[in-house]
Amino acid sequence: MQAKRLINRKQSGFTLIEVMVVIVILGILAVLVVPNVLGRADKAKVDSTKLALSNVAGALDQYKVDNGHYPTPAEGGLEALVKQPESVKNWVPGGYLKGGYPKDSWENNLQYNQPGSEGRSYDLYSFGADGKPGGEGLDADIYYSEQ
């Protein structure tokens, strides 16, 4: 009878402990990185909405220079910046805003009230991420305030 010889082979691959250590490290990195990345995306949407409000405010000011008043509800409000109201004679060909009715970063229509509250000529704002009045955090209304 021949004796069976055991052959030692070099094992390749990772041990269970090595795999678990890598998973723990990846979990820790995810906990640290993901909130920062998500927070930046949310801040970018708020900043983009503020920029859109500022651009619309500039268009409203130009409308006032051309027509002597800000768009009224009877003229369609912000719609008067993209489509000429019948009663307006000094409207800029092509409109005051390119790209249609203005929207915020969440694709909700911007809000416009004329006359505005607290003695302002108008109120220009976004309802925030939820598209509803009020709210907190990302859902809070974002007002244009440089009037």
Where are these regions (language model features)?
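N-terminal single-pass transmembrane signal-anchor helix
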Residues: 11-37
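Short, surface-exposed interaction loops/tails
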Residues: 4, 46-47, 58-61, 65-67, ...
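Short acidic, Pro/Gly- and aromatic-enriched capping/linker segments at domain boundaries
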Residues: 89-104
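Short clusters of hydrophobic/aromatic residues that line enzyme substrate/ligand-binding pockets
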Residues: 70, 97, 142
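N-terminal leader/signal peptides at the extreme start of proteins
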Residues: 1-14
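Conserved hydrophobic/amphipathic alpha-helical signal-anchor segments
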Residues: 40-86
